[in-house]
Amino acid sequence: MLKIYGFYRSSAAYRVRIALELKALDWESIPVNLRLDEQKQDSFLQNNPQGLVPVLESDGKYFTQSLAIIEYLDELHPENPLLPSGIYERAKVRGMAYQIAMEMHPLNNLRVLKYLKNELGLSEEQKSTWYQHWIAEGFGPLEKTLKNSGSEGRFCFGESTSLADVCLIPQVYNGLRFNCDLSGYPRIQSIWDHCMTLDAFKNAAPEAQQDASAK
């Protein structure tokens, strides 16, 4: 069985959980409490020297970086593909996914937020202001990209889930957690609303994880 080492609120781990659920794969969650720095323990660093989640264990091998893990799963289990068959369409989906995962998320991940608070002395209000600013900086262009794509489907690209949706939903979740106003992003809001009616997204949500009460 596939094992995913992660933290319930990690956006990167959340992405992988969504992919696993969309593909209806059997998987086991191995919680790693980032608040307690369990990712810095030698036993974890042996499998990921970066000390980051998620880590996927598959057939005795360990894989890191959420997008690499998801593409590995997509190739290993081609049913319910997360990337389109056309080369142009694949590039468009990857472009949007990378925009979220590589440009938006790194500015607001837990490591950054902890540094802002512990090292720079920002208050919770200032930290939220930081988060909201960078969400707006990312979601503005993303909303335009979605509108310009010409797709009116229920997902980022038409009527099928893709890597773009897998990346978008965790970012929206965390934006809402930090009280970000989504009223200016109706396309993003509609995708979020639809995805959260689906079992795969519900099962992958942070609140549904066994470590959701972790302190």
Per-region residue spans from a language model:
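Residue-level detector of short coil/turn "hinge" positions at structural boundaries
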Residues: 27, 34, 182, 202-203
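Phosphate-coordinating loops and pocket residues in cytosolic domains that bind phosphorylated ligands
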Residues: 46, 197, 206
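Terminal-tail/helix-coil boundary detector
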Residues: 201-215
